[in-house]
Amino acid sequence: MTISEQIKVLCVRCNISVAELARRMGTTPQNLNSKMKRESFTISDLEYLAETLGCSFERYFVLPDGEKI
C-alpha cells in the first residue's frame, strides 16, 4: 500500500476528508493532493500529518526475518 493509500485509509477511519486534513495541516487541498499524486512526502510531513490526525507515525526498516531497525 502506498503512503497516499494509507493516508486515504486514515482519513476514512478518522471520518475526515483529505481536503479537511489539508486545512487542519495549514495547507491547501491542492498542495496535499499534489504531494499524494507524486508520493513526495518528507518524514516531517508524515509526522505532522499523523499528529494532526491524533495518531503516530513510526518509521523503521524491516529485515527479511521480521526484525525492525
Language-model regions, residue ranges each:
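Short, basic-rich loop-to-helix N-cap that marks the start of a DNA-contacting helix
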Residues: R38-E51
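Short C-terminal boundary/hinge segments that cap the last helix of small helical domains
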Residues: G54-I69
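A short, Lys/Arg-rich alpha-helix, primarily the initiator
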Residues: M1-C14, E20
